[in-house]
């Protein structure tokens, strides 16, 4: 492989890349409506964008699909979150997203059970 250094990294004070975040179908198991989960994800979308943008400053060609699996406990708190799959290969982005998700608050599942969510984000600069 090469050294990876190139001219014109594209970082400029006046330029800001638009970041595209697209959604795929989440996998949800448990007694919480999909719409309730998606609402919380949408409300926190800027946190996901932040995780990506910070690393994009350092690596201009960074993009990929990051799939996170998390468990919502009986009170609506995220009790566990982990990387399920990633084509991005950026531990900094992946760990940042996991940390953000751990702080999210969902509605309490019906009957106090747990809900498992697997959610994929596709992140790329446009």
Regions from the PLM with identified roles:
Residues 1-42, 126:
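Intrinsic-disorder/low-complexity signature in envelope-associated proteins
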Residues 18, 65-67, 116-118:
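Broad gene-expression machinery/nucleic-acid interaction feature
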Residues 22-24, 73, 84, 124:
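A structural detector for beta-sheet-dominated domains
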Residues 30-35, 39, 46, 53-62, ...:
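Short, positively biased Gly/Pro-containing turn/loop motifs at secondary-structure boundaries
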Residues 63-75:
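Short edge beta-strands and adjacent turn/loop segments
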Residues 68-70, 81, 119-121:
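Preference for bulky hydrophobic residues occupying beta-strand positions
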Residues 78-93:
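Short glycine/proline-centered loop/turn elements that form peptide/ligand docking sites
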